Amino acid sequence: DPKETWAFITWTIFAIYLHTRKKKKLEGINSSIVASIGFLIIWICYFGINLLGIGLHSYGSFTSN
């Protein structure tokens, strides 16, 4: 299911973000890059996955008639 896969990717990216915030060596620009990637992935999950129209959660997809 694409929505579950992208939700897992989102959780993974933000887990990486939390780890980069805790490490002093990775703080700063690295954590901001990871946060920006996570923000883009959330937009993909929110809008992009419904355009696929496949999977168990395809009730919100757009139909092409």
Swiss-Prot record:
Its main location: plastid. It comes from the Eukaryota. GO terms for cellular component: chloroplast thylakoid membrane; plasma membrane. Keywords: Chloroplast, Cytochrome c-type biogenesis, Membrane, Plastid, Thylakoid, Transmembrane, Transmembrane helix. The keyword Transcription regulation does not apply. GO terms for molecular function: heme binding. One of its GO terms (biological process) is cytochrome complex assembly. The chain crosses the membrane at residues 5-19, 33-53. It is a multi-pass membrane protein. It is found in: Plastid, Chloroplast thylakoid membrane. The keyword Metal-binding does not apply. May interact with Ccs1. Belongs to the CcmF/CycK/Ccl1/NrfE/CcsA family. Required during biogenesis of c-type cytochromes (cytochrome c6 and cytochrome f) at the step of heme attachment. This is Cytochrome c biogenesis protein CcsA. The lineage of its organism: Eukaryota, Viridiplantae, Streptophyta, Embryophyta, Tracheophyta.
